[in-house]
């Protein structure tokens, strides 16, 4: 039997063994994080969206990736989707949701531009800071990655970021890129409670997903130092946490000292 067919049969058998509730989003993600509910920006983005949109969902924690080799991913009434943007588009259409309906087209455009800046640019600076520049591999060790695997993961980060382009820069240049992104976001938010004003928009989920890793999961590296220059961004993180994660303490491992209960 070809390898692809074997994989399909395996996934089918797994689904037979697991019956999920109808009309409930099944969110597949890795295990809970030390100080924020996930070490993945995109898990934080998607789960915050589900809470914001008040969509019924359940978590399945594990290492199983989607057919595209990505996580997080979801199942909904037997249908599998991956990539947070496609997932959110699907759920908006399925549940007839528009979290941005109160905002103008100009505001929506600005919000998406900042989302893309953070996801396509800032993300890579944080990746280098967290997983490559730290010679002690603090992040890897805190989440329990075996020492012999760390070498291969760091090499993968180095190769991926080099191919992207940002990995060709010096650490000083990368931190300069990071700081300019954060300053731009800080200037735009100003005294707003959320990205576009006193109420959150859909893009706040993505912004929070990215900032949450700098604020809670820098593991003592430099990214957090840059973020703390901007009080309004730190306050923003706390505000998003309070608004959408009242059960935060139940969703973290507190530095791997306890098991998350949700």
Regions found by a protein language model. Name each.
Residues 59-65, 198-200, 252-256:
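Acidic carboxylate-rich catalytic motifs and surrounding loops in phosphoryl-/glycosyl-chemistry enzymes
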Residues 31-33, 56, 93, 97, ...:
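Short amphipathic alpha-helical interaction elements and helix-loop-helix interfaces
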Residues 124-232:
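GST-like fold's C-terminal all-alpha helical module
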Residues 43, 84, 88, 108, ...:
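Generic preference for well-ordered alpha-helical elements
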Residues 58, 222-226, 248-256:
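Structured alpha-helical bundle/scaffold domains in large eukaryotic membrane-trafficking regulators
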Residues 2, 234-262:
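C-terminal helix/juxtamembrane-tail motif
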Residues 45, 49-52, 90, 177-188, ...:
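Amphipathic alpha-helical segments that form well-ordered structural scaffolds
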